[in-house]
Amino acid sequence: MGIPFPAGKALDALAAESDSTDSFSVKLRELSFSLSGVENQVKQRLERGVPAADVARFALNTVVRLIRRVTERAQKEYPGLPVLFSGGVASNALLRREMGEQVLFAEPRYSTDNAMGVAILTLRALERGLI
C-alpha cells in the first residue's frame, strides 16, 4: 500500500479516508484465531485495484471486530478480569472507539509498534550476554 514502517499511524490515517464497513469474518476457536485469511483478502483486494484507503479500512474493520469478539468471549470466560490493551494496535483510533469503556488502554507512549516485543527480546539478549 506504500505506507512506511512502522505502519500503525499511517494505516490509521489511510483508513480514516474511507467510510467502508466491509470486513472479513475470522473464525474463532475458543480464544484462538489466525489472520492468514485476512492477509489473503487484503492482497486480493489490492491486486483487484481496490483503493488503498478502502483496503486499509477493510483490514482495520476486520481486526477491530475480531478483537472485540475475542475480548467479549474472554470477559465471559473470566468475569471481572480487567483487559489492558498495549502495543501498536492499542493506539488505533478505530479500536479505541469501538472498545470504549469496557477495556483499559495503555498511554500512547506505551502503545507503539512492537514496543513490548522489542523490550522482551532486548531483556533476553541482555540476560544471555548477547548485547
How would you describe each model-predicted region?
Residues 1-131:
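Acidic, glycine-enriched active-site microenvironments
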